[in-house]
Amino acid sequence: MTALALPRLGVTLYSFTPYYHAREYSFEDLIRIAGERDLGPGLEIVGYQSIKGFPKLPDGFVKDFRRRVDEAGLELSAMGANADAGIPHDRLLNEDELTEYMAHQLHTAKELGFPIVRVQHSVTPDLMERLLPLAEKLDLTMGMEIHSPHSVHHPKIQALVERYEKLGSPHLGFIPDWGASLTRLPPSALQTYAAADVPRELLDAYDRQWDVFHAEGVITTDAEQGAQFRRMRELNERFGGDDVSVRIGTNAVGLFGHQRPEDWSAIMPWVVHVHGKFYGIDENGEEPSVPHGLLLRQLVDAGYTGYISSEWEGWHWNTTDDPFEMVAWQHRLMRRIFGEIEAEAGVR
């Protein structure tokens, strides 16, 4: 049998946030190291995190950026745009202001050479439709990130599906974030907080409560999410927690989603990019909370050949492991699974 068409691997520089925030490495260093350590070929950046003054670009920046990407042997996969409607301190941006805010970022993405722009849920179906002519003119694809606590079942995402079906444009799509499809709380988070003297009884209570939420299924309203936050805060107080320990409870609600992996099939025709979110790799080379085998097989079965950006978010609590090595471990895991898929298909 001829070779299967497989997704391509890459990385988002967001995975290396601790190094960047600590100024251990510059933006330019991270591009170079991603190439040197074979963490590409796909390269994704978050505009506002990576470039001072974004979306304005300094003189000569584009030429220098493209040269560095080429020298690193990388390919531009996606640029993360922000859709922060709460920029003013006393109000939210209105739709005209948010349209202008997003349009500027689309122009910058084009100038930098990115084919795909990640957008966030503040961008409504109406706003996506308003931005579509510009995206088509610039030959850009806008991908709405589906990030925990949202899921393919959330009304905001369902409304976008309806609008996509109406508009029928290849310049509109979705970006699944695997953090929406966990099977358990990340063990590395529990271990880190235990080492920080968070009471074991509290961590066990969080773990059990997350399992209860998981059995109940995805949330579809802000009220449901608020109730889950309150429940975790109640546990924190009951078991003698503090401002540190409450973080894992809030993360359990906001970051670690309950969507069934197979449910991504509902939006698979519109998948234009993937955030390969992960939190840790165990001694067996597996990610214990994110079901990589199921997720990758689903992409292969759907014929998806775009990029998967490795996105290590364990840095929120894990300050000891090397982010570069963590991404390398995930790439090894994904390549191993691709090999298993090819073997099952009889590929030689």
UniProtKB/Swiss-Prot annotation:
Keywords: Carbohydrate metabolism, Lyase, Magnesium, Metal-binding. Heterodimer composed of an alpha subunit (CarB) and a beta subunit (CarC). Optimum temperature is around 40 degrees Celsius. Its cofactor is Mg(2+). Belongs to the C-glycoside deglycosidase alpha subunit family. Optimum pH is 7.5. Mg(2+) binds at residues 145, 177, 275, 311. The lineage of its organism: Bacteria, Bacillati, Actinomycetota, Actinomycetes, Micrococcales. The active site is at 147 (proton acceptor). This is 3'-dehydrocarminate deglycosidase alpha subunit. It comes from Microbacterium sp. Its EC number is 4.1.99.28. Disulfide bonds: none annotated. Carbon-carbon bond-cleaving enzyme which participates in a carminate degradation pathway. Cleaves the C-C bond in 3'-dehydrocarminate to form kermesate. Also shows weak activity with other C-glycosides, such as 3''-dehydropuerarin (3''-oxo-puerarin), 3''-dehydroisoorientin (3''-oxo-homoorientin) and 3'-dehydromangiferin (3'-oxo-mangiferin).
